[in-house]
Amino acid sequence: MRVLHVCSELYPILKTGGLADVTAALPPALAGFGVDSRVLVPGFPAFINAIKDKQLLINIPSRFGAEEINIFLAKISNTKIDIYVIDAPSLFARPGNPYADSSNQAYADNYLRFALLGWVAARISEGLDAKWKPEIVHSHDWHAGLVPAYIKASELASGKKAVKTVFTVHNLAYQGLFPMSVFAELDLPGIFLSMNGLEFYGQVSFMKAGLYFADKITTVSPTYAKEIQIYEQGCGLEGLLADRHNDLYGVLNGVDPQIWNPKKDSLIATNYSSTTVATGKAKCKLALQQMMGLAEKEDALLFGIVTRLTEQKGLNLLIEAIGEITSRGGQIVLLGSGDKALEEVFLAAAKKYSKSIAVQIGYDEEQAHRIIAGSDVIMVPSRFEPCGLTQLYGLTYGTLPLVHKVGGLADTVIDSSLENLADGTATGFVFDEFSVESLTLVIRRAFALYNRKTDWKKVRKTAMQQQVTWDSSAEKIYQIYKNLVRENN
């Protein structure tokens, strides 16, 4: 079976969030089921610089505002992944991150940049590469939301059955919304600009295009698949998603054990397993305290936070709960960036409590590994969380997740309640209500369990025994593909 993944990020080359981890880990996991996967990405500088053995497939005349377009098939250094890269310098060779300039302002022509991505995916689905034609095209998030639309448009124009499409929602809150006027530049049938298409409350929505035109929809946890069908978390698309509930699947993300594995992680102070976790984590904790300038206290309960600094991630709650941690002798290490006001608040807290709180603004993959290995608790107090990978990394490293009961957090962390402690199923700490009071209470429970060393060690061992790799999830994705291919034959 041949599958083309279409995305804008791919670890370790280009990453702004968990999307990159998923698109890098899923193709190798699917290979175990006989799936031949390739990836299509925009020609951002990071990708252009990382590819090797590139072959020019085709040169395309000016389109979507691009002066020159070359489609390359290449390899990614140190991987077995075949990758198609759209080299269109006028659209993709820019400073800043993939979506915004160095001032964090979204590029005004993002609709053209990602329309080209979708359009090229449709051409590959039709046989642009004479030696490899996909049976499934699997697109990820709004950046690739037009992929199913272009494939459907091609099917309508030719009268020929198109390949089947899968669209994965990694975060419904990011929708790719643009003024209605841009539709004329997208080269799609006029009938697609309607409620039964891209139109979304007077705008064009790339996310809605994927949700409406894809044959099947997946999202990244069973709970999130339910949540997005109701008003509170549907982001205005709950009606469409409820209508398509029979085509909607919640499949948990997984952890890539080649990258996240305390037994062989070269980025942490010392390696450890579930049998050597006590001494291993103690060394990692001391190394983290030394690196971040915290007081070197082995008995201090150390809370790690690796996140985007946004309101969605629950950082507003955490600000109010800082005193609960420091007053009990706890420590905090935070790595992240985002909202400037939040950055300033956490930097001020670190200045005030310099031996108890350390803050590093920005994202550093190596530091993320060190924080997760060296912390006792990893905090993910998100208002909503489609899946979350950080808590899965925490489980893997014996760093107990403290999470809000939403989305994938609810699916992957079992609270250390009395009954769960008694039956040996507890793996972390869960709070139900999104409030400062609820977060404060669960922090107090974390301190209480930490003071009961025997129980803490049992929960940590159970956490590390959880099966959070891609094996099970990849099989579920494969079954979706298999059923679609069967329908098309």
Swiss-Prot record:
It catalyses: [(1->4)-alpha-D-glucosyl](n) + ADP-alpha-D-glucose = [(1->4)-alpha-D-glucosyl](n+1) + ADP + H(+). It comes from the Bacteria. It is an enzyme of class 2 (transferase). GO terms for molecular function: alpha-1,4-glucan glucosyltransferase (ADP-glucose donor) activity; alpha-1,4-glucan glucosyltransferase (UDP-glucose donor) activity. InterPro entries: Glyco_trans_1 (IPR001296), GS/SS (IPR011835), Starch_synth_cat_dom (IPR013534). Pathway: Glycan biosynthesis; glycogen biosynthesis. One of its GO terms (cellular component) is cytosol. Pfam families: Glyco_transf_5, Glycos_transf_1. SUPFAM superfamilies: UDP-Glycosyltransferase/glycogen phosphorylase. Keywords: Glycogen biosynthesis, Glycosyltransferase, Transferase. ADP-alpha-D-glucose binds at residue 15. CDD domains: GT5_Glycogen_synthase_DULL1-like. Its EC number is 2.4.1.21. GO terms for biological process: glycogen biosynthetic process. The keyword Glycosyltransferase applies. NCBIfam families: glgA, PRK00654.1-2. Synthesizes alpha-1,4-glucan chains using ADP-glucose. PANTHER family: ALPHA AMYLASE DOMAIN-CONTAINING PROTEIN, GRANULE-BOUND STARCH SYNTHASE 1, CHLOROPLASTIC/AMYLOPLASTIC. Belongs to the glycosyltransferase 1 family. Bacterial/plant glycogen synthase subfamily. This is Glycogen synthase.
